[in-house]
Design a protein with these regions (language model features):
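His-Asp-centered catalytic microenvironments across diverse enzyme cores
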Residues: 2-82, 91
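Surface-exposed beta-loop interaction hotspot
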Residues: 9-14, 18-26, 133-153
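Extended low-complexity, serine/threonine- and proline-enriched intrinsically disordered segments
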Residues: 55-86, 113-115, 171-190
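Short, aromatic- and glycine-rich surface loops/edge beta-strands on solvent-exposed regions
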Residues: 72-73, 103-117, 181-183, 205-224
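Aromatic sugar-binding surface patches on proteins
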Residues: 84-97, 188-200
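Short, flexible loop/turn segments at beta-strand junctions in immunoglobulin-like
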Residues: 99-102, 200-204
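Short beta-strand elements
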Residues: 115-148, 216-230
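Compositionally biased low-complexity segments at domain edges in trafficked proteins
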Residues: 139-180
Length: 230
């Protein structure tokens, strides 16, 4: 019932089968879901309303089965913005969809989904209308496919641009990885392994900052994330 109420509002509240019936006013404000949302087994977890008012950042959380994979984009005036303004990662049976706005104003956060082993492109699943009070001044780091394919989860740092001379706390969860290193030029800074978590305080010394991981049975490291020193 909690899923179907987004798609259809019974005129008789008894047929909603909900502990707290939804009013017509509530229903009018719900996020509008498209067929792909239901076809990939998604559920709303964090934001039921279709309009989200924020300062400059938001995290939308959707429950999703293991078979579902997501993409997201941020639009302004129907124009797609740079992919660095969204960042998706999976944890505990849900996807966290991070979005940051470059400046104040209205935006659309659009989410696409597909079943993992299905051929074809991602399908439009839902839209949120975002009202931002200000801009966040930069996007998220670039994530390689290896990051999501191995269940990676980035705790920090979340901003793509890191100030040179600053010390940043790198905290990255990479299930199954043997080693994770932050690479700047020829310098490799290996993070401390604590279970699936890799943690370390790293001084930013270069313009090009990459995070790589080594997995069992591999001699070479695979790329996970890319940052920029500014």
């Amino acid at each position: 019932p909690e899923v179907f109420i987004y798609d259809h509002l019974p005129s008789d509240t008894r047929w909603q089968l909900l502990k707290k019936p939804v009013t017509s006013e509530d229903y009018a404000g719900f996020v509008r879901l498209r067929p792909a949302f239901f076809q990939t087994g998604l559920e709303i977890k964090s934001h039921r309303k279709g309009i989200i008012e924020i300062d400059d950042q938001v995290i939308v959380t959707l429950r999703a089965p293991d078979r579902a994979v997501l993409m997201a984009e941020l639009l302004r005036d129907e124009d797609k913005l740079d992919e660095s303004y969204t960042f998706i990662q999976r944890q505990n049976g849900s996807y966290n969809i991070h979005a940051i706005t470059p400046r104040a104003g209205p935006y659309v956060l659009r989410v696409f989904s597909k079943n993992r082993h299905e051929e074809g492109s991602y399908a439009w699943a839902l839209d949120y209308r975002i009202k931002a009070a200000k801009g966040g001044g930069g996007g998220f780091p670039k994530a390689f496919g290896t990051f999501s394919e191995n269940g990676g989860y980035l705790h920090s740092p979340m901003h793509a641009k890191l100030k040179r001379g600053s010390t940043q706390v790198f905290k990255i969860q990479v299930p199954g990885a043997e080693k994770v290193a932050v690479i700047m030029g020829d310098n490799w800074h290996h993070l401390k392994k604590e279970g699936d978590m890799f943690i370390g305080n790293i001084e930013i010394q270069d313009k090009h900052i990459r995070v790589f991981a080594k997995f069992p049975g591999q001699e070479q490291y695979d790329g996970l994330l890319v940052y920029t020193g500014s």
